[in-house]
């Protein structure tokens, strides 16, 4: 708990009443010696200044007045005539003094209300009545007990007679429910209940042998319950009494090491009690259950008084004889001093930790197991993500049981309705009807125009539709009408009056004259038709190519045409400015001549009509000139030209350029009416990034306009409708134009960043209304690297998460239910290895010492690995180390090759290696069957201080720690002696197994079958190799014991050619029996190889039959006098396996990448990372290193999941189950699964497994 303030006084104290900022009144403690040996006694008032965050400043009294004597007790009541109340002091000289708190604070000289000396001796205790603040009870020496009325302070009356008792009244307390009931405690051990109304004793309790009473306190809610304490150092007890059975206490609280001096029962929560005493400690209890929650920081002298704040029970104060009154709170568990010391100790290395860590002072680090009653809410509600409201209420009033209700909630019902309607319309695919509906419902001209343009883009010929939308429909009819108005198509215009002639002007007159001139020659109509006659036709109109009257230009053109040199003829015609002749020649000369003629024509017409420049741009395919230089008042005509003539590759960019010009015009002229025209250009060019900016600007303006004119709608509803309209336009536009976002893979600088922000906002809105799939759909349109989108996507995934189905497995599943039936019996003929040395004399069968994490064992049977080839059996003892590395020894010399089981089909031979010798100080352990796993701590377990407070209050002992010779402190000594003579029985006793630590053990995963002594037990590890049994009667020397190789993994190749799981063992191809001897002598196994607690325990009995393995011929029994020679083996790897074509390595992703975690493993990442963040945010700073290490190891696991390596499918499924158990706070199940994976799948475990273990422990300890 946090110490907020300190008052540097050895004094009794009282809290100020009322809800104002808390003050404390202190009176110099009678009989106490001050640090400066001053004998001054006074009453002081202190303002704690709790609103200030600076707790280092020393407090100064705000009021002070001298007294004639020291104080034994103080009381402060909220009296009606005084705004700050009245302070009463119980003085050592027997005087009862009353002060006006207001006048004390103001410094008035008449602050003393009265001074009364009715008591003949010292007043030991006093208290105001909680129901009637004018009544004051005082008790003191010689059993004197007075009741005073502030309205008539000079006439108190006494309870009891003077001759009744002569013992001192040490304490008293008014009943909190019945105003006229008072209890007193005396030095003679009498606890007396008084009825003030009748002025008589109601009941007397015998305080367990008339032990002196130091404090009494009534239950704040139950009027018949009270608590008493004794100040005796030999018997520091607190008794809980129920007056309905006053013969004996209901409960006894034991926790203090010396006499209890003060009690304070929290008036707001009857489950909280403070006690302080001569052991310098202040304890917090639950008096209803007798549970001690913990202790507050220990001081250096007696704590003689402790009190809750009457108005705000978050605060309490404790006075001690070390010269301080500490004001503390129950809302935190660490002090600044403790945090600084913890950080200092965190930096200590292994060399000086034990030398310096004991200087750490005792601090309080407990937390209340449940919220105090004043913080409990009878009901509550919270909005949940995904359109849910979670409400909590009491099942029954007065009981702590609650019910939780989750109900759907929508801020605006129209949001869900419009979203659903739009999504259904999209599924139907009728985009045109959507556009028509939205256009008819548009609230502004801009919005209506946008939907019309989008509707035009849906048609089969979007450009033609855009031209029609621009108003250029029926061009042919319009041109014909205009020509008709000019009179060019009417013959009767020749003679139809003056008005027609005047309208045509001079051009019309010339036309009429020429027409009438040629009408007189009817043969002219057949001229051209005559020229098109057949090859043999002749005409009666002869002509001369050269008649002598030609100009040089005519001759040059004629000669060039005769020779087919159209380019030369064109040059002559252009030089002579004969444009009509030039175009005719260019037509005959081909495209090059046509382009040359056109270029010359346009160069000569620079000052001609405007249509000439337009025609030049069209002919020259240079519409950029029109886009950049045409007047913006004619943007519609420019847009029509683009829709008609622009190339498909340039059309979008031309439209964008025209829109950019219009946007620039908007900025220059502030004419927002052009915004609709720019939107048209951007829509026609499919430039989503440009039109979105305009739409968002229109959204803000329309929203603001709607808010100003709205009467019933809320601002949220208006904003959501506008946002919905924007999303609908963008969605339809993307589908119509088949828009492809090419920037989703970028990390930043997105062109559509404004749209992405709206997508995220819209996803949040629809998710709030319960449409999670719709939200996911739009979040998928946002780049993966967008920071806000990543957060939103994680929220959606968590809200949409379902139980991940487990992958189908080909292996036998691991059973987690207890198994109580016996295992199948093994064959009576054990398989024998190909070669073994003679065995030692038989000895009593033994079992390995207790392994708390090993599976349960059977006496005469052993489960079978259905995927392991038949192998010989051997007995291998294990040490008592529960934390040894997996796989037996941690070190194997180079070249060492343990004996291998025979390959399939070979005839096994008799004989086997004997068991390794035991150390001289060991004896066989007794056969024991365990049904529950013990909770033994490991070297990497969570520090003890993380979950429970330190038990010693004096500090760490200075005794030097014992030398640790092993990195695993509980590891047994290694075997160091040679083998005993054959047949030598063990003579000395084995060391005892260390007891398990305190704590509840996890439930057993497999119940051990019945033990049948004296047969050995064997661990039920389905992945371990079958053990070997020792033969009998051999007289040869005993070779060093081999380590038992693990069987092949059930996920690898079939048992005929499996790669060995032991990296030091040869491949299976080299394990076949060979008639030749090996040229290399066998290397002995490493000494002192401690067996792993997770490998199978040995046994002398054969294993049960393997129902999945090929049958093995019965072994032939060889003579026991001599073993056959060893068969040759090779240490080289298998040629077949080494030459086997390697599969392509899976892709490796960088550390920290989580985007490739498969769906079935995603719950592991999400749950564990979320729980790790919860622990990280609440863990004390002294455990920062452990928390960061656990987080680093979990990231290793997440990297494996992201790369889909190391962990097999069944392990992934089990880890998902473990994660769900942690999420449900089912830590026993999580721990059981963790032990199972660590025991049976060690090859998949790594550094990450330690992080999972630490997270389980930290999560359990974190509230």
From Swiss-Prot:
Biased composition (Polar residues): 805-818, 873-883
Region (Disordered): 487-510, 801-1158
GO cellular component, one term: endoplasmic reticulum exit site
Biased composition (Low complexity): 830-863, 925-934, 952-977, 1062-1076, 1128-1143
Coiled-coil stretches noted in the UniProt entry, renumbered to this chain: none
WD repeat extents: 5-47, 66-109, 118-158, 164-204, 208-251, 255-295, 298-338, 382-407
GO biological process: COPII-coated vesicle cargo loading; endoplasmic reticulum organization; protein transport
Family, as annotated: Belongs to the WD repeat SEC31 family.
Protein name in UniProt: Protein transport protein sec31
Organism field: Aspergillus fumigatus (strain ATCC MYA-4609 / CBS 101355 / FGSC A1100 / Af293)
């Amino acid at each position: 708990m946090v110490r907020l303030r300190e008052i540097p006084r050895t004094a009794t104290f009282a809290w100020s009443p009322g809800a104002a900022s808390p003050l404390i009144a202190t009176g110099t403690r009678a009989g106490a010696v001050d640090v400066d040996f001053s004998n001054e006694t006074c009453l002081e008032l202190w303002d704690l200044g709790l609103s200030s965050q600076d707790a280092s400043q020393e407090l100064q009294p705000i009021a002070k007045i001298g007294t004639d004597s020291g104080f034994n007790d103080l009381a402060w009541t909220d009296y009606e005539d005084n705004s700050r109340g009245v302070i009463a002091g119980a003085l050592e000289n027997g005087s009862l003094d009353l002060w006006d708190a207001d006048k004390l604070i103001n410094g008035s000289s008449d602050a003393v209300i009265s001074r009364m000396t009715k008591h003949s001796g010292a007043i030991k205790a006093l208290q105001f009545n909680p129901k009637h603040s004018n009544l004051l009870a005082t008790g003191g020496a010689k059993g004197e007990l007075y009741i005073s009325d502030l309205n008539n302070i000079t006439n108190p009356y006494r309870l009891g007679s003077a001759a009744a008792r002569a013992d001192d009244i040490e304490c008293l307390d008014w009943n909190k429910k019945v105003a006229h009931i008072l209890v007193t405690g005396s030095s003679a051990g009498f606890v007396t209940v008084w009825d003030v109304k009748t002025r008589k004793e109601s009941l007397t309790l015998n305080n367990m042998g008339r032990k002196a009473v130091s404090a009494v306190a009534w239950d704040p809610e139950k009027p018949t319950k009270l608590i008493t304490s004794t100040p005796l150092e030999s018997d520091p007890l607190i008794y809980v009494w129920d007056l309905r059975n006053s013969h004996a206490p209901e409960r006894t609280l034991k926790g203090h090491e010396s006499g209890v001096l003060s009690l304070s029962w929290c008036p707001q929560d009857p489950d909280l009690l403070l006690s302080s005493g001569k052991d310098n400690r202040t304890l917090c209890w639950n008096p209803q259950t007798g549970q001690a929650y913990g202790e507050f920081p220990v001081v250096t002298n007696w704590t003689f008084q402790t009190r809750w704040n009457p108005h705000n029970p978050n605060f309490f104060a404790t006075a001690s004889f070390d010269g301080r009154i500490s004001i503390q709170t129950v809302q935190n568990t660490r002090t600044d001093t403790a945090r600084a010391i913890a950080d200092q100790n965190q930096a200590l290395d292994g060399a000086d930790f034990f030398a310096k860590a004991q200087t750490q002072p005792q601090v309080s680090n407990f937390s209340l197991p449940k919220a105090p009653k004043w913080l409990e809410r009878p009901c509550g509600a919270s909005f949940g993500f995904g359109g849910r409201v979670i409400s909590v209420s009491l099942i029954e009033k007065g009981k702590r049981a609650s019910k939780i209700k989750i109900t759907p909630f929508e801020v605006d019902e129209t949001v869900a309705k419009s979203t659903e309607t739009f999504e259904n319309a999209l599924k139907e695919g009728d985009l045109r009807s959507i556009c028509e509906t939205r256009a008819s419902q548009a609230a502004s001209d801009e919005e209506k125009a946008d939907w019309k343009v989008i509707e035009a883009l849906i048609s089969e010929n979007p450009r033609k539709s855009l031209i029609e939308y621009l108003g250029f429909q029926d061009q042919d009819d319009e041109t014909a009408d205009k020509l008709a108005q000019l009179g060019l198509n009417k013959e009767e215009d020749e003679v139809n009056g003056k008005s027609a002639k005047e309208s045509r002007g001079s051009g019309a007159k010339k036309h009429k004259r020429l027409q009438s001139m040629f009408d007189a020659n009817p043969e002219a109509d057949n001229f051209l038709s005559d020229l098109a006659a057949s090859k043999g036709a002749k005409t009666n109109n002869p002509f001369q190519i050269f008649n002598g009257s030609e100009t040089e230009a005519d001759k040059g053109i004629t000669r060039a045409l005769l020779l087919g040199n159209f380019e030369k003829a064109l040059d002559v015609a252009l030089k002579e400015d004969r444009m009509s002749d030039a175009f005719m020649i260019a037509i005959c000369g081909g495209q090059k001549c046509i382009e040359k003629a056109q270029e010359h024509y346009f160069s000569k017409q620079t000052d001609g009509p405007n249509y000439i420049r337009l025609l030049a741009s069209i002919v020259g395919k240079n519409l950029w000139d029109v886009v950049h230089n045409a007047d913006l008042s004619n943007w519609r005509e420019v847009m029509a030209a683009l829709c008609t003539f622009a190339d498909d590759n340039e059309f979008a960019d031309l439209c964008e350029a025209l829109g950019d010009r219009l946007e620039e015009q908007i900025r220059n002229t502030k004419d927002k009416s052009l915004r609709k025209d720019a939107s048209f250009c951007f829509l026609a060019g499919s430039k989503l990034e440009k039109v979105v900016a305009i739409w968002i600007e229109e959204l803000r303006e329309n929203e603001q306009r709607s808010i100003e004119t709205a009467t019933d709608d809320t601002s949220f509803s208006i904003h959501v409708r506008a946002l919905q309209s924007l999303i609908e336009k963008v969605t339809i536009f993307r589908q119509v134009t088949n828009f492809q976002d090419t920037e989703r893979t970028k990390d930043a600088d997105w062109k559509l960043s404004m749209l992405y922000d709206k997508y995220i906002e819209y996803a949040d809105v629809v998710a709030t209304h319960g449409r999670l799939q719709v939200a996911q759909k739009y979040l998928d349109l946002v780049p993966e690297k967008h920071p806000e989108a990543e957060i939103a996507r994680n929220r959606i995934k968590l809200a949409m998460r379902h139980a991940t189905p487990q992958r189908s497995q080909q292996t036998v599943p691991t059973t987690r239910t207890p198994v109580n039936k016996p295992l199948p019996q093994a064959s009576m003929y054990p398989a024998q290895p190909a070669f073994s040395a003679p065995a030692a004399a038989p000895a009593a069968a033994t079992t390995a010492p207790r392994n708390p994490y090993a599976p349960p064992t059977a006496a005469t049977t052993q489960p079978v690995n259905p995927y392991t080839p038949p192998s010989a059996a051997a007995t291998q003892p294990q040490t008592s180390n529960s934390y040894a590395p997996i796989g037996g020894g941690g070190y194997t010399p180079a070249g060492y090759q343990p004996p291998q089981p025979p390959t399939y089909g070979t005839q096994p031979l008799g004989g086997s290696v004997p068991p390794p010798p035991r150390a001289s100080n060991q004896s066989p352990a007794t056969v024991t069957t365990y049904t529950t796993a013990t909770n033994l701590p490991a070297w990497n377990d969570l520090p003890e201080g993380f979950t429970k407070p330190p038990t010693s209050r004096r500090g760490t002992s200075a005794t030097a720690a014992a030398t640790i010779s092993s990195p695993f402190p509980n590891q047994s000594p290694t075997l160091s002696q040679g083998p005993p003579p054959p047949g030598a029985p063990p003579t000395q006793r084995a060391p005892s197994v260390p007891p398990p630590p305190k704590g509840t053990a996890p439930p057993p995963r497999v119940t051990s079958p019945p033990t049948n002594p004296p047969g050995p037990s064997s661990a039920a590890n389905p992945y371990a190799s079958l053990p070997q049994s020792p033969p009998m009667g051999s007289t040869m020397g005993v070779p060093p014991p081999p380590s038992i190789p693990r069987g092949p993994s059930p996920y690898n190749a079939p048992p005929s050619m499996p790669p060995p799981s032991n990296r030091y063992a040869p491949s299976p191809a080299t394990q076949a029996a060979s008639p030749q001897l090996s040229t290399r002598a066998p290397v002995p196994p490493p000494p002192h190889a401690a067996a792993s607690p997770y490998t199978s325990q040995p046994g002398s009995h054969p294993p049960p039959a393997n129902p999945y393995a090929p049958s093995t011929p019965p072994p032939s029994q060889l003579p026991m006098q001599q073993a056959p020679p060893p068969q040759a083996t090779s240490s080289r790897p298998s040629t077949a396996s080494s030459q086997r074509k390697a599969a392509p390595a899976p892709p490796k992703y960088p550390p920290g990448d989580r985007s490739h975690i498969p769906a079935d493993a995603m719950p592991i990442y999400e749950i564990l990372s979320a729980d790790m963040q919860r622990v990280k945010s609440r863990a004390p700073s002294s455990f920062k290193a452990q928390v960061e290490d656990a987080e680093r190891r979990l990231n290793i696991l997440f990297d494996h999941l992201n790369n889909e390596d190391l962990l097999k499918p069944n392990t992934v499924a089990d880890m998902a189950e473990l994660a769900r158990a942690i999420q449900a706070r089912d830590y026993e199940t999580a721990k059981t699964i963790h032990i199972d994976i660590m025991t049976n799948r060690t090859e998949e475990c790594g550094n990450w497994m330690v992080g999972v273990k630490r997270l389980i422990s930290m999560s359990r300890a974190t509230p």
